[in-house]
Curated annotation (Swiss-Prot):
It is found in: Cell inner membrane. This is Macrolide export ATP-binding/permease protein MacB. The gene is macB. The chain crosses the membrane at residues 271-291, 526-546, 583-603, 607-627. The lineage of its organism: Bacteria, Pseudomonadati, Pseudomonadota, Gammaproteobacteria, Oceanospirillales. It is a multi-pass membrane protein.
Amino acid sequence: MPLIELCNIRKRYPAGDQDVEVLHGIDLSIEAGEFLAIMGSSGSGKSTLMHILGCLDQPSDGEYRFSGQPVTAMDHDQLAWLRREMFGFVFQSYHLIGTASAWENVALPAIYAGVPREERKQRAQQLLTDLGLEDRLENRPSQLSGGQQQRVSIARALMNGGKVILADEPTGALDSASGEAVMDQLRSLAEQGHTVIVITHDAKVAAHADRVVEIHDGNLISDTRHHDHLHERAKPVSAPPKESVMPDPGEVMEAVVMALRSLRANWMRTLLTLLGIVIGVGAVVVMLAIGEGAKQDVVAQINERGTNLLVVRPDRGMQRVADGVIATLVPADAQALESLPNISIAVPEISGNVTARANGMDISTSVQAVSEDFPSLRDWQPVQGIFFGEEDLKSYSPVAVIGQTVKENLFPEGDPLGQFLLLDSIPFQVIGVMSAQGASDRGEDQDDVVIVPLSTGTLRLFGQNYLNSITVAVDDVTQIDATEAAAVALLTQRHGKQDVRVFNMASLLEMVSETQNTLTALLGSIAAISLLVGGIGVMNIMLVSVTERIHEIGIRMATGARQRNILQQFLTESVVVSALGGIVGVVIGVLVGWLLMLFGMAIVFSVPVMVVSFVCAAGIGLLFGFAPALKAARLNPVEALSND
């Protein structure tokens, strides 16, 4: 049974509205171990015939059998298996990858055969040594002469065994001495049992072969044998197997290595591609950190006031007394509210602004007249002295507890305890200093305050008994809504109408949290758009990369790369560059966040956000890299090789 059998092979190419046929019914049989030359002038169809023989192209009509197996019925992976395991190509233009060393070019077919890196490196170096290139192992093609490059090409053809060597004008770009050396090497391979097929226009080159087939205008016109016997060591061949669609882990790692090499070779383009992803990921990290910081800041301030609180205020539409206070709430209402189930404390409050004077200094500050339960309600205790008690309220004691700001302004050097200050010319004795609170959620200084007993304030400072608010603490927060309804009902009954409004701090916290979550989502969406734009940039750059590397893709396909290998390689490059951008983006986002923290902005980083941002960056590389990678994988090997 012939190793190669062509029956009525025709090949047509589209030319406008018509097809041009370049091979006209070729019939050819080649036995294993033959040294055959296919000779013809330029345009005779000999290169097209070689492409069909080497499974780089498919015939338009006819039947091609390899080792009895119908090649025309094989799928892409089986054709790649034949190119990888059976054929070895020696091209006139060498077709070496410019960014790879000599041994790496030779080892290329073994990558797609799944040979471990060290094993293929040793074999590649041994092949080059056998061909006299032991001192050129690390040289790139640009550092080699034409003859040396052709020997690298021969070594590559032998990397996986090269049972069939297809040499297309192997001496065409060489001087006579180098050309003769190459033909001697091909003769030696034939003597070792390889099937050698040389494509040439030169009769002197064809004379080295045992059999010469001449082609003219797409027709075989002669078939001459110089020797009638085959070499005794002709190598047996097998049919291509069905291959697994699952990639080998070694293939993935090799794809990563090749991706890093390719990205390093075009570092400026890689940097520009990274920039879009870096900006997108960094923006996501910073924006969400700002949003989360703002949310937690507001929530913390609400929590400081207590989420178990109900604040009862007069309805703004109610009647006002002469000084503008709404005449609705009175201290007795607070006592009534304390009688309700689930209410532990009810603190009445009157507040206003006064001029405070002490030690010859005047300041404008706020004053709060409250009951003795105020520190417990607000979880705000004195750090010096004491807070007034029930007896002080009963006796209308002229005592005061001051905030830290008032202390610093009126008593900058001395101990304020026991000293007097005037509030609108009314003397009060300082009995305590509250702990520092800082600014409120509205930016107000909570330490710029003087706190006095409610009874004293109503009598001596405000001259009226109507309250600004009553703050209620509930025992069971899960029942806070029911307690709120009960409070409104009680006060409506007492006043004969509904003239109050109740502010639920738990509901306020929930509302603020939802608002902040919406704001954070908005900020994240804006940042995600930047990441999306970065992904489009990745796709554009990868499309450019595919266009620039069509020739390299052709070389890889000729040496046995499957479509999935090409797809995997370009997808890996896209994912690697996006993942690198994701890592750098996270780092830069954290650095920018820390910088903003130095300026007092509330920033809260989230590790899950960083992880998700990185994963999204890699996912964007996968998503936007798929179209360019698919384009590369679907290239025709012959067309890709001719794109130089």
